[in-house]
């Protein structure tokens, strides 16, 4: 069943409810009720599925007393959920405004949602993401090229990134970055110059990012997609970057970390096996903790090395697919 917004925007009831419950409608989170976290949403989703409503969309027409009686929520929880579910007018206008800048929202109830996020993160996958660009790129094999802003990229690092970008284009891998100044912006420029596809996953500033020259060009050419879990006008923060990197590591076959401040979730990705092939560049001393915890060292990549590495990734992906077939 579809629910039509006041401006003619169509969403399934489940998708609509997921956005109402979890989406911040202002960048500074000034809301009548605080949107649900992913963990909170999963709990409400499970309760709805176990109830006579059958799914999350069935809650759209339930009053506060119904939420208390049939889901077993407290009065405070029920009021919060009810308030969030009745932001439909504000949500419709907010989505229409975003669409004017080429931004839409996709939920786990939509076919366009990246399947790898659900497969890898499972219950921790975000209920929705903001998206712009060519969504078909999200299903391509991909590598991440990562670094933090404020660290100078020397000629040797640039040459290594060139080899990765060239190899990715040659073998049909998208290149994923975090969109920050430094390694990410250099990588995006090389993709634009040398060929291939780019996926930027942001920790803030989505609307402004889409207007940068390189990204605007790649979007116009159908060679880029941009994702974010944050309001398009939200500022970049370290906490947003940590949440962003969970998506990065879940979406890629391999990640190449050129530099880090140690606060971007790389160690968690290693510990949780979110990304089985995480490489750390030996040319940056700050990568030592990653190397000590099991990241694979790399330095001095040569033309052709990418082809050998991706054979290992392909075998890992095939093994994972076989496991999913058995579930």
Model-derived segments and their meaning:
Residues 2-30, 93, 101, 108-327:
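Glycine-biased, small-residue-rich flexible motifs in mid-sequence functional cores and linkers
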């Amino acid at each position: 069943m579809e629910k039509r917004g006041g401006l003619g925007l169509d969403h399934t009831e489940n998708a609509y409810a997921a956005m109402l419950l979890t989406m911040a409608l202002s960048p500074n989170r000034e809301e009548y009720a605080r949107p649900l976290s992913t963990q909170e949403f999963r709990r409400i989703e499970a309760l709805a599925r176990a109830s006579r409503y059958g799914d999350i969309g069935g809650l759209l027409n339930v009053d506060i007393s119904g939420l208390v009686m049939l889901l077993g929520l407290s009065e405070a929880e029920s009021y919060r959920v009810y308030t969030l579910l009745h932001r439909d007018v504000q949500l419709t206008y907010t989505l229409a405004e975003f669409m004017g800048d080429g931004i839409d929202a996709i939920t786990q109830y939509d076919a366009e949602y990246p399947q790898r996020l659900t497969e890898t993160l499972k219950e921790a996958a975000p209920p929705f993401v903001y998206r712009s660009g060519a969504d078909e790129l999200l299903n391509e094999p991909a590598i991440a090229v990562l670094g933090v802003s404020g660290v100078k990229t020397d000629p040797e690092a640039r040459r290594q990134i060139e080899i990765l970008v060239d190899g990715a284009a040659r073998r049909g891998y998208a290149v994923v970055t975090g969109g920050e100044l430094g390694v990410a912006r250099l990588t995006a420029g090389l993709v634009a110059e040398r060929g291939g596809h780019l996926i930027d996953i942001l920790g803030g500033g989505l609307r402004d990012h889409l207007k940068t020259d390189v990204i605007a060009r790649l979007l116009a050419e159908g060679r880029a997609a941009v994702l974010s879990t944050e309001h398009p006008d939200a500022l970049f923060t370290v906490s947003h970057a940590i949440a962003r990197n969970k998506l990065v590591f879940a979406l890629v076959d391999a990640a190449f970390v050129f530099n880090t401040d140690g606060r971007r979730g790389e160690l968690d990705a290693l510990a949780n096996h979110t990304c089985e092939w995480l490489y750390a560049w030996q040319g940056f001393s700050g990568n030592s903790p990653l190397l000590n915890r099991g990241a694979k060292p790399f330095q001095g990549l040569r033309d052709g090395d990418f082809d050998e590495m991706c054979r290992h990734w392909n075998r890992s992906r095939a093994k994972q697919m076989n496991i999913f077939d058995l579930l």
